[in-house]
Amino acid sequence: MAKSNKRRPAPEKPVKTRKCVFCSKKGQTIDYKDTALLRTYISERGKIRARRVTGNCVQHQRDIAVAVKNAREVALLPFGSSTR
């Protein structure tokens, strides 16, 4: 005998769209030497935060990822957390 599917649909949450910070502020650039800016896009475990979390556009998220990777190579940012 087949089960009836009586689940309620999930309530719709309002989608909060975030604007890209770098698109709204045209003069702000992404540089690997600006560690204060790059640390806002890195989690406490050392991972780069996702685009849906940061609210950046595709191009600026890629630029942030490249800048973080360059800063890690020059030892300005840590590669990851040493605690497990």
Swiss-Prot record:
Swiss-Prot/TrEMBL keywords: Ribonucleoprotein, Ribosomal protein, RNA-binding, rRNA-binding
Keyword Flavoprotein appears in the UniProt entry: no
Gene Ontology annotations of biological process type: translation
GO terms of molecular function: small ribosomal subunit rRNA binding; structural constituent of ribosome
InterPro entries named among the record's database cross-references: Ribosomal_bS18 (IPR001648), Ribosomal_bS18_CS (IPR018275), Ribosomal_bS18_sf (IPR036870)
A cellular-component GO term for this protein: cytosolic small ribosomal subunit
Subunit structure of this chain's protein: Part of the 30S ribosomal subunit. Forms a tight heterodimer with protein bS6.
Role summary: Binds as a heterodimer with protein bS6 to the central domain of the 16S rRNA, where it helps stabilize the platform of the 30S subunit.
Family classification: Belongs to the bacterial ribosomal protein bS18 family.
HAMAP family tied to this protein: Ribosomal_bS18 (MF_00270)
Protein name per Swiss-Prot or TrEMBL: Small ribosomal subunit protein bS18B
